A protein has these predicted regions:
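Conserved C-terminal active-site "lid" loop/helix of NAD(P)H-dependent oxidoreductases
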Residues: 200, 219, 261-305
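N-terminal Rossmann NAD(P)H-binding glycine-rich loop of SDR-like oxidoreductase domains
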Residues: 18-38
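NAD(P)H-binding glycine-rich loop region in Rossmannoid oxidoreductase-like domains
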Residues: 60-104, 128-132
Length: 328
């Protein structure tokens, strides 16, 4: 082993350890890179051994298991300096499935941290949807998970509620750019609705900064340089510019069509299938206030977002095109 590699390996042993759930997801993949760049070692809870090429440069420790496996949770958090809980369920066929993952598993992880890593800073990445728990089973389960974690860990826990997150690798917001390529662009949400967003790179920078700060039991969120949010015409207009559609024409999607699609989703859910659009998701989509207030905003004065809406959407589209998800 050469001297520089030996010194690096020795230094790594003394770097702080972050235990991460949900590392294989969209946000998680970006977060693991950001943690490594900030000098953290990482220990990841994954359902299976990862593809070597995906993680070879980052050299994470891997615990194979799930958030429902108490033994795996114990191996994950033992001796960790920080625990970042990203894992969650965004679609499910049954209400109890949302609660098993988004609430019960979060509580189990918090209890494990309390027992095996009591000095660790626990950071739970929740969702802005938790602010409106009556809208859907998903929102209610995220709210229940927040409350469970805060009840168990008190001031050792920080809860972060991101708004809509987009960026390279995200399949959920890909639909926005696919719609924006059309001559007639349908508006899915209410004309008066406002939606806050954040680029995934800015989100993970905020997570790292927050977990490096002392915990104090906060419940916060993050956003780009417009925390008050965007109207749907602004979001789709920016998406159209990013995909080189110079003159999109916006048309309000007929409510009857949206409700018809949602009804099909409800029927599929009753039959035990997961559907991304159902009546509950439609209520979330058409909710009029997904803005972030100044009191909720977690942004240190020296950490301005690196991406505004136009530069962030351009970055996402460039990645989609390189990856073949959007045509050139």
């Amino acid at each position: 082993m050469n001297r520089s590699l030996a010194a690096s390996t020795a230094a790594d042993r003394y770097a702080p350890m972050a235990a991460v759930t949900g590392a294989s997801g969209f946000i998680g993949r970006h977060l693991v890179v950001a943690l490594a760049q900030a000098g953290w070692r990482t220990r990841l809870l994954l359902r299976r051994e990862p593809d070597e090429a995906q993680w070879s440069q980052l050299r994470p420790q891997v615990v194979v298991g799930s958030v429902g496996d108490n033994a795996a949770l114990a191996r994950l958090v033992d001796g960790a300096d920080a625990v970042i809980h990203l894992a969650g369920l965004i679609k499910a066929a049954r209400r109890r499935q949302f609660f098993e993952v988004n609430s019960d598993a979060a509580a189990a992880l918090a209890r494990t941290v309390q027992r095996l890593a009591p000095a660790a800073h626990f950071l739970q990445v929740s969702s802005l949807a938790a602010r409106e728990p009556t809208l859907s089973d998903y929102a209610a389960s995220k709210r229940a998970g927040e409350e469970a974690v805060r009840n168990i860990l008190g001031p050792r826990a920080t809860v972060l509620r991101p708004p809509a997150v987009y960026g390279p690798g995200d399949r959920e917001t890909l639909l926005l750019f696919q719609l924006a390529r059309q001559r007639w662009v349908p508006l899915l949400g209410s004309q008066d609705a406002v939606v806050a967003v954040i680029h995934v790179s800015d989100l993970v920078r905020s997570i790292v900064a927050r977990v490096e700060a002392p915990p104090c039991g906060e419940l916060l969120t993050v956003a780009d340089d417009r925390p008050e949010g965007y109207r749907w015409t602004e979001l789709l207009g920016a998406a159209a510019r990013a995909v080189d559609n110079p003159a999109p024409r916006f048309v309000q999607a007929p409510q009857s069509l949206l409700y018809g699609i949602a009804l099909l989703g409800d029927l599929a859910r009753m039959a035990g299938s997961c559907s991304m659009l159902n009546s509950q998701k439609l209520r979330e989509l058409r909710h009029e206030d997904w803005s972030v207030s100044p009191a909720e905003l977690a942004r240190p004065a020296d950490m301005a977002p690196r991406f505004n809406l136009d530069t962030g959407f351009a970055d996402a589209v460039a990645w989609y095109r390189r990856s073949g998800w959007l045509p050139p």
